Amino acid sequence: MKAGDKYQACVDALAAYAKGIGFSQVVIGLSGGIDSSVTAVMAVDAFGAKNVHGVLLPGPYSTGHSIDDALALAENLGIESHTVSICEPFEAFEQVIRKSYKEKLEGLASENTQARCRMVILMALSNANRWMLVNTGNKSEAAMGYSTLYGDTAGAFAPLGGLYKTDVYEVGRWRNEQARAAGDVEPIPENVFVKPPSAELAPGQKDEASMGIDYETLDKLLIAVQEQGQSVEDACDALGFDIMQATGLLARVDSYAFKRAQEPPFPDVKFYG
């Protein structure tokens, strides 16, 4: 399926889902990364700029360039955006837990609590304004369990949930090209495409380092085995991958099925095959 067809299928599915459950306005957390950027553009194409509400949720490890990219995206799209820091609620959680358990939130507990603080704010705004919360997750992250239950896994619908990370970049590039060809402002800032993806939940954090594999390699393997039905051996031969590493990765994918069971619905479209 071509990039434009993938993009439009996601937009159509998002619009149909919202209409089916009675929502005409949506809210999206804007991180300045590729997933939230592409999701926001899709939402504008589905509902119109006046019906899309962006929320920046900077935390203790958010970078200035990510905030700038999120603000630039919102300006390019002409959508309403607000900034709500998670630092105070996150610190409050830390203090309450330390008071009872005499320990500081560190590592994964700290990272996941930040993600859940963001979701509490987004859901509060959703409830207060009757805005449907749009999830921004993709299929690569879901496969690897690289997400926080009841944090960034929350949302009513995930328009990118059927696309692997490399294809999120592809459809984002395609959408920018369409805007440029029409003489319009390219909605997604160039920096969003070139910077390394990061959850920004810890100092210097990078997605691919945290997962132990780059998205391009991961996606090629997952598409070959899970979408096209190739055996692990055949996929590794064709792609030049180490079979032991591939087997380990696929075992990890299987181990995170419990997380995927709690992910929101996504477009029922056969993107690969």
Regions found by a protein language model. Name each.
Residues 1-31, 36-273:
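ATP/NTP-dependent adenylation/nucleotidyl-transfer catalytic domains that generate, transfer
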